[in-house]
């Protein structure tokens, strides 16, 4: 018996062409190219999710560094002072405090300076 798969094949092609709808030129009209670009786009989104974590951490560290330097400490000294003081607060929260609540951030800087002095 011969295998008839027109329905399945059409459904599969339609899925890829629908996903490639916004692509330019032949990439949105030709099945083979649309499928290649679809796979590539999924790879880019996967990699992007990994890079996002690095980028956010860099942003938090930059914000903390700027705020700490305004108070007279380098970023590394500030983090070391917090570790010596036994304060466990993550960089995301510290950067939020540095941006939105400078008074609370100054308290952490004060704690770090006291720990470094002793």
Curated annotation (Swiss-Prot):
InterPro entries: Ribosomal_bL20 (IPR005813), RIBOSOMAL_L20_CS (IPR049946), Ribosomal_protein_bL20_C (IPR035566). Keywords: Ribonucleoprotein, Ribosomal protein, RNA-binding, rRNA-binding. The keyword Acetylation does not apply. The keyword Ribonucleoprotein applies. It comes from the Bacteria. HAMAP family: Ribosomal_bL20 (MF_00382). Binds directly to 23S ribosomal RNA and is necessary for the in vitro assembly process of the 50S ribosomal subunit. It is not involved in the protein synthesizing functions of that subunit. This is Large ribosomal subunit protein bL20.
């Amino acid at each position: 018996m011969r295998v008839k798969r027109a329905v399945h094949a059409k459904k599969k092609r339609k899925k890829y062409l629908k996903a490639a709808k916004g692509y330019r030129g032949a990439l949105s009209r030709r099945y083979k190219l649309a499928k290649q670009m679809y796979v590539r786009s999924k790879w880019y989104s996967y990699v992007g999710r990994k890079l996002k974590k690095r980028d956010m951490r860099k942003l938090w560290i930059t914000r903390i560094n700027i705020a700490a330097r305004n108070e007279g400490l380098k970023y590394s000294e500030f983090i070391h002072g917090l570790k010596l003081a036994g304060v466990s607060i993550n960089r995301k929260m510290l950067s939020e405090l540095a941006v939105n609540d400078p008074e609370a951030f100054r308290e952490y800087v004060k704690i770090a300076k006291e720990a470094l002095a002793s």
